[in-house]
């Protein structure tokens, strides 16, 4: 294989590997923004509620929380992150939206 072709091929492989997850991130972020999640949560720092990365760090290693978090989102929560954080119920979200948000948050 010619060196130029090899370099070109090798340099595009990482970009191809990142394309899929980037699209998932954008979709999840847009959904979180559209549904008002960003009014209280941020990606890398606590705002009114805990950051998405802190939520992911706490729960991603526990498979049972992938099933529990939809109930927390839908029903609201208090005390999971101390007395300061109270999340209001988000009952207007569809099952599919809640599942997409849980998957996206846990991927952070």
Give names to the regions the model predicted.
Residues 1-4:
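Positively charged n-region of N-terminal signal peptides that target proteins for export
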Residues 15-32, 58, 62:
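Electrostatic cytochrome c docking/interface patches
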Residues 24, 28, 44, 65, ...:
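Stable alpha-helical elements in mature extracytoplasmic
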Residues 50-56, 74-102:
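Axial heme c-ligation environment in periplasmic c-type cytochrome domains
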């Amino acid at each position: 294989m010619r060196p130029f072709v090899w370099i070109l091929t090798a340099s595009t492989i990482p970009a191809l590997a990142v394309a899929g997850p980037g699209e998932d991130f954008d979709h999840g972020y847009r959904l979180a923004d559209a549904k008002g999640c960003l009014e209280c949560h941020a990606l890398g720092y606590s705002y009114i509620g805990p950051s998405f990365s802190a939520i992911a760090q706490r729960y991603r290693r526990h498979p049972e929380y992938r099933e529990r978090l939809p109930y927390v989102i839908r029903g609201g929560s208090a005390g999971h992150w101390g007395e300061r954080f109270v999340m209001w119920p988000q009952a207007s979200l569809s099952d599919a939206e809640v599942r997409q948000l849980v998957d996206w948050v846990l991927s952070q």
